[in-house]
């Protein structure tokens, strides 16, 4: 077993986390994506993780389907994140081992996972890059 995979999320996660509220508009979300170059944002209300919203979620606001006509640009940009976010979020605990993180990232095909405490308060985020940094540290020690 690779030793770095036994490290915990708490020692490798990114804090503080940039998050948004459910009332954030798609227009603001696009500006945040452009400024931060993130692929997704955790959605937090009163400190608790309530969802996650991705670039794909934001793009789907303007997608034309058989069931839905194309919305006006202003209406799409005014849409609140709570209308498009995923509420069923895969999140992990700070004491989770990187081995488990690696399995979850690949199983769910996501780039990062929110880290929450027992009360669902968002305490960090762990991304593929964080796991790669841990691997690099261990590689340099060898």
Where are these regions (language model features)?
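A glycine-centered beta-loop-beta connector
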Residues: 33-36, 41-57, 105, 113-130
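The conserved cystathionine-beta-synthase
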Residues: 20-37, 44, 91-109, 116, ...
